Amino acid sequence: VEGEVYAFSSLFTAVVFWLILKWEDVADQPHSDRWIILIAYLTGLSIGVHLLNLLCLPAIVLVYYYKKTPNATAKGSLIALLGSMVLVAAVLYGIVPGIVKVGGWFELLFVNGLGMSFNSGVVVYIILLAAALIWGVYESYTEKNKARMAISFILTIALLGIPFYGHGASSIIIGILVIAALGLYLAPSVQAKIKERWRITARTMNTALLCTMMIVIGYSSYALIVIRSTANTPMDQNSPEDIFTLGEYLGREQYGTRPLFYGPAFSSKVALDVKDGYCIPRQSEAGSKFVRKEKTSPDEKDSYIELPGRVEYEYAQNMFFPRMYSSSHAPLYKQWVDIKGHDVPYDQCGEMVMVNMPNQWENIKFFFSYQLNFMYWRYFMWNFAGRQNDIQGSGEIEHGNWITGIPFIDNLLVGNQDLLPQDLKNNKGHNVFYCLPLILGLIGLFWQAYHSQRGIQQFWVVFFLFFMTGIAIVLYLNQTPAQPRERDYAYAGSFYAFAIWVGMGVAGIIRMLREYCKMQELPA
């Protein structure tokens, strides 16, 4: 799995970042936007491999901002970063689920409403979406009528489902409000009154629509999943043979959810309510789902039936930034952190009992000791300091740690390595770099950051590539102890970024030697 998915995903990460640098070299030329459009196409393709490639977008947006803004400021950089986050959200929470959502509405209309066969609504939706994209590109290219240009753009955004965030009626209300606000902003009369820097030009709209079209074309690779499932192959997990089951497949609903910003701890108890004299757990439903109705006769028309969506329990005790949330991993959490906790009252249907909850400091300690240190920095140091062996560890001093090859440092970290048995000493995964790549990377990092105004801009580009493909993934995954395998493959993009600093370190050393030692450049 790792070789098939993450190697391909790493390729997309490298190519997309290289392409934005190619664009930077020719940004002032007439047809430079084609590099941006190619990036959009590869981003759409990469969605069919893994969503990790979307994490390159903040770095890409910074490159774009610094190139287009000679006198860039910290405020402008922050706005560009916020814009990049909106862009990631528009793809991740807009286009990816939105196409399925709006396609599902068309499917229900044509199958349940008009009595047509399965997938007829999806076919009509795809045709309309393609027509809207082509119309929008044409109108923004010709610039014959600004009103039609705005209408075609808004129609495309609506058909993509980007404004319809959430579930049920609330998503429709949000979508209508967003579309209304966008329509007001793009109205020709409003565009004529606002400052020029905030106007949406035809070129910007055309490029945005072309990029959207390329993302959709790349994203359409998921059609293979539906075609394969329709053939009823022996391996057909979730059977995504229609737009609704495809939505569950894309949402990875079989894996459940993990709390990120606010949620329960491992010792939290389900909130209870008394109803008709019975004590029942409090639950919430995440919308509803539609499944194909089994026919009782061949003459019966195709139709979908509505079923309750995913049901989740609500907990009485919650905390911010919950890192220790899994009740099935409670003993393992206690191996990583000495949890004293604190007692909080819990209403057990009229009976008050005390529940011991980990405090916020213990929660943060687990985040730093396990999730950040063991599940990220350990892998980072494997690549730039050294690796003890390739035996998966769970915190033991003899399995899978990072080392340097420098005895007095390794003795402090994991003990005397000379005392290990021969099978561990001679492990083929054993490798030491004496921290030389790490030192070069740190030199490159500081040299780039303090070299010049151009250098600090380049530093922030590389930093956000490093952060978003590394630590940001750690924050999002919220991993539990005792993972089934080592997860170093997920952070390859972050190691790419630090490798750039390693190369910068070599350049920095040469520059420093040239400056301080008056070293002359040798002839080629």
Feature map (PLM): residue ranges:
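Multi-pass, polyprenyl lipid-linked donor-dependent membrane glycosyltransferases
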Residues: 1-15, 33, 46-49, 55, ...
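Transmembrane-embedded, aromatic-rich helix segments that form part
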Residues: 10-12, 52-64, 97-100, 174-178, ...
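Membrane-interface transmembrane helices that cradle and orient dolichyl/undecaprenyl
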Residues: 16-35, 62-73, 134-144, 188
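Short hydrophobic alpha-helices at membrane interfaces in multi-pass membrane enzymes
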Residues: 26-44, 73-86, 145-157, 523
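Hydrophobic, aromatic-rich transmembrane alpha-helices
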Residues: 128-141, 186-189, 193, 434-454, ...
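Transmembrane alpha-helix segments characteristic
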Residues: 150-159, 211-217, 433-440, 453-476
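Hydrophobic/aromatic-rich transmembrane helices and adjacent perimembrane loops
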Residues: 176-177, 483-508
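Lumenal/periplasmic acceptor-binding loop at the mouth of the active site in multi-pass
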Residues: 229-445
